[in-house]
Amino acid sequence: RANGRKSFLRFYDGMDIRPRETEITVALKRLVTDASRIVFLTGHGERSLYWNDKGGLYSLIQRNGRNALVNQGFDVDTLNLTGRTVIPEDIDILVIAAPEKRLSPQEQGLLDSYIAKGGNLIITGEPGKQELMNGLVKNLGIGFKEGIILQHEEADWEEDFIVGDIAESGAQQTGVGAGLLARQYQVAFPGTTALSFNAGYGFQGVPIVEYAGDTLMLALKRQLGGEEQRIIVSGDADWFSTEGLALRKDDVRLNNFGLFMEMLHYMTYQQFPVDNSRPSPTDDTHYLDIADIGWIKGLFIGLIPLLVLGGAIGFR
């Protein structure tokens, strides 16, 4: 544009290389509005955007991938808190993905200040890190329960491979998982702990993903400064890794990527990714009487074959 704002519309890797309506809409929207800024915390062994192995998040920044965040309306960056005095206010979503080490007291103070000011946040943990994670979220009313969730329904699966259900209440209140619920999708959490919630910290807690009575993902929200603060916490970090977003299992309709996109849509107040879905048509069923079947049968068995035969003879 004349004001210097630029937007890129890319061709992508794979068989379907051309941009679709969603990517075209995103590119146009970025010319008239700011992209959402999503920042990943580093410095404590968190899942890295630059890992392309198990647990890595590289697919989120691979520019030639259709589903990369940059192609869905996001500016992506990392943040190391060492030497900082404040977390920047222009961050739309701060992601803390399964840290391996505790934040220092000064870093924890910066995070607590960011939360107190109404910053939006995604936090993911892992089994075995409950004590560390509970220290991180101590002011949110969230608890990472001891142990690991196991399943015994599918003998061919790993015991810690959990297929969770979208919570209807959460989908209704936040929209996260609503599209999956409507199309009867589930999500896979390969190694997760359960979450607890205490409402005494000023947040409303809404379950997003559940399994056998346990909450695996929880949304927190509260009104602060005239705007709703939104925080999402999950007991697993693998579900949105490069491998996790592509997980498939026979006889189960999994859609981790869909959950990830709907989560970001919620966290950015419906700005990005762009939602180009349409309402399902209401007039999609036609009912026939018994009397109608006769002429339909005659049409397909008699008239149409005769027309085809006549056309073939005429063509010769």
What are these regions (language model features)?
Residues E153, S280-T282:
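A glycine-rich phosphate-binding loop feature that marks nucleotide/adenosyl-phosphate handling sites
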Residues R1-R63, A68, P273-S277, T285-G302, ...:
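Hydrophobic targeting/anchoring helices
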Residues L49, K54-F272:
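Acidic, S/T/G-rich, low-cysteine, solvent-exposed domains in lumenal/extracellular/periplasmic regions
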